[in-house]
Every structure is written in structure tokens, then in C-alpha cells.
Amino acid sequence: MSYDMDITKTPPAHEPERQYYYMAKAKDFVEKKSKEIGRPMTYFVKTFGCQMNARDSEKLVGILEQIGYVEGTDEHSDFIVYNTCTVRENANNKVYGRLGYLQNYKKKNPLMKIALCGCMMQEPEVVENIKKHYKFVDIVFGTHNIFKFAEILCNNIESGSQVIDIWKDTNQIVEDLPVKRKFSFKSGVNIMFGCNNFCSYCIVPYVRGRERSREPKDIIREIEKLVADGVCEIMLLGQNVNSYGKTLDNPITFAELLREVNKIKGLKRIRFMTSHPKDLSEDLIMAIKECDKVCKHMHLPLQSGSSRVLKEMNRHYDKEKYLDEVKRLREQIPDIAITTDIIVGFPGETEEDFLETMDVVKQVRYDSAFTFIYSKRTGTRAATMENQVPDDVVKDRFDRLLKEVQTISSEKAKCYEGKVVPVLAEEMDDQKDGYVTGRMDNNSIVHFPGTEDMIGNIYNVKLDECRGFYYMGEIKEDA
């Protein structure tokens, strides 16, 4: 897409042409300001939350760099963007805490612009709070119109006042906008947006909107471009990738998409997340088994092992169905790594319910698990439930669960000692000079001797020693 657009004319009506018009307009502003101050204008993007947010931030950075900003090192930069998360209350508090510092920085730098975007901004009470107490924030937008970032910025530049642009929902997907990847050798790729599951504790459907899938041809085209640019590993992203394709005019399944992506020449690894247990089909299991580029790792959120609690959570499966799915996975792919999410302290959770969760943990023997204390989110059904579990009881259960998960994870990790496995070198080890940090097919971390020029390549590494949740190893030969 060309940036040679006449910004004196009326902006185009269609996307993405309209956004390229506003990028050109914003670039004109940035170039003039840079000349005035005698240096490039800088940006700093802080990402809170999940892989979806991380990918959104790469899009924001792509737009910022296209309009002339250069990357700064911290929050003293000229343009600060907080891409926020609201899955747990603590995430909101982190943002509010940092805004206080930004206000002081802005007093010292009148050119500074502050933008807040992401899931937290989809909550009406948050936006009202910002309007009342954080008037120094320049731009506020949500999850549905990130593609309009340049246009919203231009509105702020022209008006000189706070611009708030929040969409309640959308079915729009805008392709072909700039993206600046964090890593040269791996990339996330959105295959869908939104969620239709409405788990009773979860705010995601309210802030990310209804489920909508990208066209497979657009996904394949994006991955082919990434591979041509040196990417060897991609992560297919969605709130529930297992339900991919249902909203398309010509529906296809996630298993079918995996098989198509697996055919792309030059691509070496395919990961995906997140999978909802209710949509785990036999066809998907077979696709994971048969596609040689698909990593043998499944993140399968349990949330609770109690069928009663799962019903209250609106998860659409019970303990027996979940265990059956794990059994089917391991029958077809014996060496698959299974990881999970577990919530402790959901309203009404009894000791018996908790012990059901512990039972699933002991039966499944997860490679690792993300364990969370239930966080009440305004607007969800669970927030109004009675029988909130006392904090001391929740903490006791959380500690017991964490101990069990860590014990099992450590035991499972020990089984790989002495084996030679392919490892993708990802970055220099920040704890040990002369070592690189890489990742196995099953997502485990390995540290081994290496240099910076090895990053982005896959090596066969002998796992000499397991140190809890990571390995020390040495290269045997190129993979």
C-alpha cells in the first residue's frame, strides 16, 4: 500500500485506504514536530495481558513507525501507549498506578501524548473514571477499532483535546495494515477475534466482542509473507481457536486450517492458542498428530475439576468429558505436552469441589499449569453470585494446588533428561554469559551455549540437566 496520498483531499471511505490516508497526515505532523525540536519523536508501547494483546501492540507499533516515530526506551518518550488488560482486577490497578507517573512526565514534556487502548477501555466505568480523573490522557480507544489508531490520532492533533472512541461491538476485520514484529523469526497470527462462550467469570466476550473469523486465504497470505521475511514459527491466535471458521460464508474447521498452514513451504513450527475443551474434535486431534509442523503441545484450560462448578462457570463440559478428551489426546499423541489454566475460589466452591480439581490434576499430570485466584469482574454473572469464598480459604487451596502442580511438572520434566530434542534459539540468556535461551516443541525452556547469530535457528540439543522448569543442554548438531 502506497503512502503517497494527497492529504489535502477528502479521506477515502474504504479500508484500509482510509487509514493509510490518516497515516500520511499524521506523518506530516510528526515530521514537522521533529524538525522543530531537532530530534526524532519517540514512542513507548507497554503491553498488559495476553498474546492477543501482544499481537495488537505489534500493529500499533507498526503504525507508529510508519508515521515517523522511533522507538524510545521508557515512559519518558513523546508518545506513550498502554495496551491494557482487564481479565483480573489487578491488571486495572497496574494501569491506574502507572498513570500517576505519566502525569508528572507530561508536565515536563508538553509534546507528550498518552494513549490508552485495549480491553480495559471497553468497560464504561473505566472510561468515565479516565474522563473525570485522568484528563491529561489524550486518546482512549478499545479493542474493536485498533485499526483506526492513525485516524484517532489525527482527530486528537486537529482538536487539541481528549479523544475517546469506543465501539461496543463490530463485525469488521481490516487487513493489510502495518505490523512491526517483536521477533524476526516468530510471529503471532490472528485467525479470529472475539468469543461467544460467555463463561460466567469471564469478561472477554464483553470487551472483545462476538466471535468472527478471518478468511483462510488472508491467513495463508499473511503467513507466506512472514515466512518470506524470515519467520520460521507462527502462533495461530484466537480466544477459542477450536471454533474457528463458524462465522465464515464458506465455513471451514480449525483442523482444516491447520492442514493448509502445514503445507506452507519454509515454515517450520506451528503453535496455537487457546483451545476450549468443548470444541476439541477428533479431526483436530488427528490434524495435530499428522501435521509434522504442528507442535505437540495443547493448552487445554480446565478451570475447575468439579462438574458442579463447571456448570456454574458455563463451561459446557464436565469432569468426565474433560478427562476423556485428555485420554483421546494421549492415545493418538502419547508425547503431547498438556498445559492448563485453573481458577481457585470460584463463588460457592466447596472443599469437595476443590478436591475434585486436585483429582484431575493428579490424573492428567499437566506439564505446567497457570493457577489463578478467582477475580470478580463487574458485568459478569459470577460477580453477582452469593457464597464468595473467604480469602483465607482461597489462599490455602491455592497454595495446595500450586504445590501439587509444581511437583508433578518437575517430575514430568525430569523424564526428558538425556534426550536430544529440537530447540529454537530465541534470545541471549540474560542470566548466563555465552548462553542462548531456546524453546522445545513442547514449549519447555532450554539454556545452552551459543552466540547471538544462532537466534532464529533450530538446533538438536541434548538435555543434560533438568533444573525444575527449565533445562541446561548442549548442541549436538543442526536440526
Where are these regions (language model features)?
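Conserved SAM/AdoMet-binding glycine-rich loop
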Residues: 113-116, 123-125, 228-351, 362
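Conserved, mostly hydrophobic/aromatic
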Residues: 199, 219, 236, 272, ...
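Radical SAM enzyme [4Fe-4S]-AdoMet core and its adjacent flexible, acidic
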Residues: 50, 245-266, 313-316, 376-407
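Short flexible coil/turn linkers enriched for glycine and charged/polar residues
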Residues: 182-185, 195-197, 294, 304, ...
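Proteins enriched for Cys/Gly/acidic motifs involved in redox and nucleic-acid/cofactor modification
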Residues: 2-244, 283, 298, 320-327, ...
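Glycine-centered loop/turn positions within well-structured domains
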Residues: 147, 197, 242, 278, ...
